[in-house]
Amino acid sequence: PERARRFLGKKHPLPVVPANARNVRSVVRAARGCHLLVNASPAKFNESALRAALRLRAHYLDLSANLGRNPFKAEQLGYAKRFAQKRRAAVINAGVAPGLTNLLVARSAELLDRMDTVHIRLYESTVGDTAVSQWSAEGLFDEAVSRPRVFRDGRFRLAPRFSERERFRFPAPIGAVSVVLAAQDEVATLPYHLPLRHLDVKIGGNEIDRLRRWYRQGKLRPSRGMVAARFPGTLTPRQVARLIRCGKLQNARLAVAVLAGGTRKDLPVEIRWDVSFPTLYQIRMRGLGVTPIAYATAQMAALFVRYFPRQLRGVFAPEALPAETRRQVLNAARTRGFAITRKLRQGKRSLDEEW
């Protein structure tokens, strides 16, 4: 409760109730009377939150998957029948990556007669004199020590950590950067809902470069645990503002690119989506002390809540939502400061469009 108050501020009217996220009964007591349970805790608590939502007969939404039992299938999908029996809906992985990326892949599938390949590329960077976690330290550590999941030739595989390095060009002002395979959750849902042959996710930026360097130095091993010096806790808005004022944190940036390849009218087609988000500086100018990843994830979660499909029954990844719901969320994302651009190439023809 104390940490939550530091995020919200002492005068915020939102009630803060303590709960043990590992204990289903504790979550049920804290959330009694709610209609929608939003789980923004680390993914290792997903199943406790899912069971609590079922006991409460509440709808459910979360931001990521744990993949502890099956590295290739989101554990939340196993609760589909139970949510259907309770006549409730669960929307999972409803953030930016996964979340927004899934919506863009699904939109690409609508534009193509057949979609074969999907490449998702992410960029995360900070400019400053101190190490800052743009998102959950637990999530960053889990991604750093987990083997990346890929979908190749219609089969799931585990790839070596930080492998398949390549140069990828993001729109200005980022430009060309090195990207490597990452353990992202999109691979654990997209192949189950869309006919694909190839899918991978790579990340670039100085944060992933730092993790890759530590890995090559032998400093990233699950047995060694999470070292606080390398994986600092998530900063409160007040701490972010203090670092900016002191000049220790100048800026931070997040970008997403989704490339989908397939055919339309028997011709090869490539669709590219680029999404740029408000930078740390731009967010600070709005009076908010949060990082770009935290801001973008919170905005996407809010949009999924706003357009929550209460009429559905079961568990749904973003790409499995009704087309109208997906379009509403994508259109609303643009009003939150997300610049979404689509480029379509068919043969020698190229067309640039603002979403």
Specify the residue positions occupied by each region the protein language model found.
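Short acidic/histidine-rich motifs immediately flanking catalytic phosphotransfer sites
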Residues: 11-12, 31-36, 55-56
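Rossmann-fold NAD(P)-binding glycine/threonine-rich loop
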Residues: 64-90
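NAD(P)-binding Rossmann-fold cofactor-contacting core
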Residues: 1-7
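Conserved Rossmann-fold cofactor-binding substructure of NAD(P)-dependent oxidoreductases
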Residues: 18-36, 40, 45
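ADP-ribose/adenylate-binding Rossmann-like module
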Residues: 42, 52-74
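Adenosine-phosphate binding glycine-rich loop
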Residues: 82, 86-125
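C-terminal catalytic/substrate-binding lobe primarily of soluble NAD(P)-dependent oxidoreductases
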Residues: 110-355
